[in-house]
């Protein structure tokens, strides 16, 4: 058996797949069970009791993780005049107007987050077919269409995570790296879960937090018991 396969088998043995853990236990297990030599990303998958096919049950938003994501984001901003200067001062990697729109249309995609001032959306709209499928299209619901570019850029650089429920009712989001301390992963995961709780649609009925699973890039999934959040989260 190859060495990598042996490590994966050993990692799975650490986790009881039939058990649901507390969030703190899950953070410790994910770190312990990560089999790769590189600094694996830690993700959270939350299955919600919503039907995203219904517009009034779409769950979408963004949250700043207190300890960041461990990823260095390249931020592109569509702005002009003073707002362009503010974006540059805040640390944006790329700032421009029509010239930048043209550059993206020509194939430039060396960025991870896109922010735009409202007056630029007429131009940015031309990039819908390019940015949309990649989840990069600026949207006021997640704070990426705003005149407050200074805050938007600063939050993106600090570890602001965007989330959106998929067709199966699941939200996937990065919450850090295996190298993070257990408490940092715990705080980040809790911040995301509480953001999802606050985003619960009024039309969602029954159990809202159906399941929560934490995993590293190469490691096994660790199930977290949603009951630990029910007191704060849902009315059936």
Curated annotation (Swiss-Prot):
Pfam families: Ribosomal_L1. One of its GO terms (biological process) is translation. Keywords: Repressor, Ribonucleoprotein, Ribosomal protein, RNA-binding, rRNA-binding, Translation regulation, tRNA-binding. It comes from the Bacteria. The keyword rRNA-binding applies. PROSITE patterns: RIBOSOMAL_L1 (PS01199). One of its GO terms (molecular function) is structural constituent of ribosome. InterPro entries: Ribosom_uL1_bac-type, Ribosomal_uL1, Ribosomal_uL1-like, Ribosomal_uL1/biogenesis, Ribosomal_uL1_3-a/b-sand, Ribosomal_uL1_CS. GO terms for cellular component: cytosolic large ribosomal subunit. Binds directly to 23S rRNA. The L1 stalk is quite mobile in the ribosome, and is involved in E site tRNA release. Protein L1 is also a translational repressor protein, it controls the translation of the L11 operon by binding to its mRNA. Part of the 50S ribosomal subunit. Belongs to the universal ribosomal protein uL1 family. This is Large ribosomal subunit protein uL1.
């Amino acid at each position: 058996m190859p060495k990598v396969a042996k490590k994966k088998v050993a990692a799975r043995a650490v986790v009881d797949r039939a058990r649901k853990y507390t969030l703190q236990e899950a953070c410790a297990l994910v770190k312990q069970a990560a089999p790769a030599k590189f600094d694996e990303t830690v993700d959270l998958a939350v299955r919600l009791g919503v039907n995203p096919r219904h517009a009034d049950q779409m769950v979408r938003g963004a949250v700043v993780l207190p300890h960041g994501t461990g990823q260095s984001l390249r931020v592109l901003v569509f702005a002009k005049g003073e707002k362009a200067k503010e974006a540059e001062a805040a640390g944006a990697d790329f700032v421009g107007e029509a010239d930048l729109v043209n550059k993206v249309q020509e194939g430039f995609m060396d960025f991870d987050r896109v922010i735009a001032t409202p007056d630029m959306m007429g131009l940015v709209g031309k990039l819908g077919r390019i940015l949309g499928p990649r989840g990069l299209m600026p949207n006021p619901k997640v704070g990426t269409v705003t005149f407050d570019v200074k805050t938007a850029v600063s939050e993106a650089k600090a570890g602001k995570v965007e989330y959106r429920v998929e067709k199966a009712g699941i939200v996937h989001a990065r919450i850090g790296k295996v190298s993070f301390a257990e408490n940092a992963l715990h705080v980040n995961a809790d911040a995301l879960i509480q953001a999802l709780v606050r985003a619960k649609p009024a039309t969602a009925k029954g159990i809202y937090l159906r399941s929560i699973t934490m995993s590293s890039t190469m490691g096994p999934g660790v199930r977290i018991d949603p009951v630990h959040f029910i007191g704060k989260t849902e009315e059936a």
